[in-house]
Amino acid sequence: MQGRLSAWLAKHQLAHRPLGFDYQGIEILQIRPQDWPSIAVALYVYGFNYLRSQCAYDVTPGGGLASVYHLTKVQDDADQPEEVCIKIFVSREDPRIPSVFWIWKSSDFQERESYDMFGIIYESHPRLKRILMPESWIGWPLRKDYIVPNFYELQDAY
């Protein structure tokens, strides 16, 4: 099912895949990582001037990873602002997605958290480093295939 934004992107020949709507009627689009920079700029020009949230998740154990962006079109006279959910799927072996820090500054800490927990590399992010875990931490704690270090091994490390 194609929504209004998907039709607009198709009209402008921007590659995407409509995934339907969520329970609130928000359109969900899948974007390939290599298409994300140009589509992000197009969405900003379209009016999506606010990145409400960015998160990531592990799709399946040993499978792919996903980065999710929730964008909102904030206007003075809008009591029901238009929203869209963008999903970008990457392989676990090479989890690279272009950063949108240069478009939405609010993605700074959010992309860093996704990097810290899942190991997704946001290319061209100005400060991509761990934000929650110590710099010396090994692995990506929220991946489904993550093996938790033995508590006593960690205790001995301090």
Swiss-Prot record:
Pfam families: Complex1_30kDa. Keywords: Chloroplast, Membrane, NAD, NADP, Plastid, Plastoquinone, Quinone, Thylakoid, Translocase, Transport. The keyword Metal-binding does not apply. GO terms for cellular component: chloroplast thylakoid membrane. It comes from the Eukaryota. Its main location: plastid. It is a peripheral membrane protein. Its EC number is 7.1.1.-. The keyword Oxidoreductase does not apply. NDH shuttles electrons from NAD(P)H:plastoquinone, via FMN and iron-sulfur (Fe-S) centers, to quinones in the photosynthetic chain and possibly in a chloroplast respiratory chain. The immediate electron acceptor for the enzyme in this species is believed to be plastoquinone. Couples the redox reaction to proton translocation, and thus conserves the redox energy in a proton gradient. This is NAD(P)H-quinone oxidoreductase subunit J, chloroplastic. It comes from Angiopteris evecta. The gene is ndhJ.
